[in-house]
């Protein structure tokens, strides 16, 4: 079992981290337990009642959080012609086709998100082994393969979060920074949960959102009572 440092132990002192909480309380306690000297990211982990080994139960999508993520996102757009100027006008940090692919083949990866127009995906496929493992490969299901590059760039810069359930059926996503405070974090969480709810596979059986935990980068996770999720979304 990994050993935790003094700051971690101090953060959880007097707190029952095994307690099952409402969403609101889990967020509040997570923010209250933050102890790092930097502005930690608040994360959520959601255990879904799906079996990802079946393609029709794969939950994958994207959502633009109302309050963003509180960080600068560097965006690269793979495109040609007029789309290059459109991407840059919308705020893209890098735009191009062959030249960008060539740079990446040489080891350059100074961007956080990638977008591509459909007509250059064959070219982008040449660097799929580089982009894929880093979560940078553009994908139509998350809206990052599109001819509407202006909208995609603006949404990505504004705090667009892509998510995908892992092999264990758990979905991980950031919700913003500790400095946002509970109200903005809860707003972002509601947007995420609404989107995940809409993506529920028709073949999924039983409880969809089975378990949830909220944590900060360095802090402990606080468990959420899944029966309170529906009430939170309807509130």
Swiss-Prot record:
Which Gene Ontology biological process is one annotated for this entry? regulation of translation
Q: Name one GO cellular component term.
A: cytosolic large ribosomal subunit
Question: GO molecular function: any one?
Answer: structural constituent of ribosome
Q: Is the keyword Glycoprotein in the record?
A: no
**Which PROSITE patterns does the record cross-reference, listed alphabetically?**
RIBOSOMAL_L1
One Pfam family for this entry, by name?
A: Ribosomal_L1
Keywords of the record, alphabetical order, are: Repressor, Ribonucleoprotein, Ribosomal protein, RNA-binding, rRNA-binding, Translation regulation, tRNA-binding
Quaternary assembly: Part of the 50S ribosomal subunit.
Family classification: Belongs to the universal ribosomal protein uL1 family.
The entry's function note states: Binds directly to 23S rRNA. The L1 stalk is quite mobile in the ribosome, and is involved in E site tRNA release. Protein L1 is also a translational repressor protein, it controls the translation of the L11 operon by binding to its mRNA.
Q: What is this protein called?
A: Large ribosomal subunit protein uL1
Q: Which organism is it from?
A: Nitratidesulfovibrio vulgaris (strain DSM 19637 / Miyazaki F) (Desulfovibrio vulgaris)
Q: What is the lineage of its organism?
A: Bacteria, Pseudomonadati, Thermodesulfobacteriota, Desulfovibrionia, Desulfovibrionales
Its gene is rplA
């Amino acid at each position: 079992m990994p050993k935790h440092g003094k700051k971690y132990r101090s953060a959880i002192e007097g707190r029952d981290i095994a307690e099952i909480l409402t969403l609101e309380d889990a967020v509040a306690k997570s923010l209250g337990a933050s102890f790092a000297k930097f502005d930690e990211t608040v994360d959520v982990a959601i255990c879904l009642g799906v079996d990802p080994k079946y393609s029709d139960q794969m939950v994958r999508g994207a959502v633009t959080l109302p309050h963003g993520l509180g960080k600068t996102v560097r965006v690269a757009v793979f495109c040609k012609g007029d789309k290059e100027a459109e991407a840059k006008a919308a705020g893209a940090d890098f735009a191009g086709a062959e030249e960008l692919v060539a740079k990446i083949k040489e080891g350059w990866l100074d961007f956080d998100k990638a977008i591509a127009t459909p007509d250059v995906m064959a070219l982008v496929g040449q660097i799929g082994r580089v982009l894929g493992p880093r979560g940078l490969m553009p994908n139509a299901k998350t809206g990052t393969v599109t001819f509407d590059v202006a909208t995609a760039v603006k949404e990505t810069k504004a705090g667009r979060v892509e998510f995908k359930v892992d092999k264990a059926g758990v979905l991980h996503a950031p919700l913003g920074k500790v400095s946002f405070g509970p109200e903005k974090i809860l707003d972002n969480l509601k947007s995420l949960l609404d989107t995940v709810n809409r993506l529920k596979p028709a073949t999924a059986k039983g409880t969809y959102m089975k378990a949830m935990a909220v944590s900060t980068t360095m802090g402990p996770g606080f468990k959420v009572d899944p029966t309170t999720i529906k009430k939170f979304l309807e509130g």
